[in-house]
Design a protein with these regions (language model features):
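Extreme N-terminal, non-catalytic leader segments
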Residues: 1-12, 34
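P-loop (Walker A) phosphate-binding loop of NTP-binding proteins
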Residues: 15-17
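Conserved lysine of the Walker
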Residues: 22
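Post-Walker A alpha-helix
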Residues: 25-26
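Post-Walker A helix-loop "phosphate-sensing" segment adjacent to the P-loop in P-loop NTPases
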Residues: 31-39
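ATP-dependent small-molecule kinase phosphotransfer cores
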Residues: 41-102, 108-112
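Conserved phosphate-donor/acceptor-positioning beta-strand/loop module used by diverse small-molecule
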Residues: 102-107, 117-140, 171-172
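NTP-dependent small-molecule kinase module
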Residues: 161-217
Length: 217
């Protein structure tokens, strides 16, 4: 079922410390649900092995990123781990125009800025099952130097501390379970009365029929 048949599209923010698994979860949700579209972010960092420009990120030079920021092309942007990351307004508009929820995997800074501009956004924090597991995931990244690893650990601590700012927290102990939990959150949020504007006329029609039945009794 497409979102157009259910209600009004809304932004969905997935945040997690580096190595928290938010990108894997986002890909699964987009692959399994036709009411979700992915907003590809921009970054100035170098691509990791296997990453593809336009699918994982739009990889920009610092100069190109700054030019886009000056033009007001970003809905939000932030500096994370020494690199710039940003969400393009046109990416958000593209997904909304297709009648789908806009799914974004962005950091805590970006989530704060985006939520100011889009207060209807649903924020979900992906929490690792333990600090030890997160450290193992970070250590497995071949692109991590010792200095970069230490920076990511410090930043991860600060990001986990911000989890209380989110409407939902999902522990990513097992990918299938985490994806299922977030899918349930999307279904529940989509069924909220204030998001079902498309059903207003149907609600009024049911009330009218019941009123007529009572009046005719």
């Amino acid at each position: 079922m497409t979102l157009a048949a259910r209600g009004v599209p809304f932004p969905v923010i997935l945040s997690a410390p580096s190595g928290g698994g938010k990108t894997s979860i986002a890909r699964r949700l987009v692959a399994e649900r036709n009411d979700v579209g992915y907003s590809v972010s921009c970054t100035t960092r170098a691509p990791r092995p296997g990453e593809i420009d336009g699918r994982d990120y739009y990889f920009l030079t610092p100069e190109a990123f700054d030019e886009a920021a000056v033009r007001g092309a970003f809905a939000e942007w932030a500096i994370v781990h020494g690199n710039r990351y940003g969400t393009l307004k046109r990416e958000v508009e593209r997904v909304i125009a297709a009648g789908r929820h806009v799914l974004m995997d962005i950091d805590v800074q970006g989530a704060r800025a985006f939520s100011v501009a889009f207060p209807d956004a649903v924020r979900i924090f992906i929490l690792p099952p333990s600090g030890g597991v997160l450290l193992e995931r970070l250590a497995m990244r071949a692109s991590e130097s010792a200095a970069s690893f230490a920076l990511r650990v410090r930043n991860a601590r600060d990001e986990v501390a911000a989890a209380h700012e989110y409407e939902y927290v999902v522990v990513n102990n097992e990918l299938e379970r985490a994806v299922a939990q977030i899918a349930s959150i999307l279904d529940a949020e989509g069924a909220r009365r204030d998001r079902l504007r498309a059903l207003d006329s149907q609600i009024d029609s049911v009330i009218a029929e019941l009123d007529a039945a009572v009046g005719g009794a």
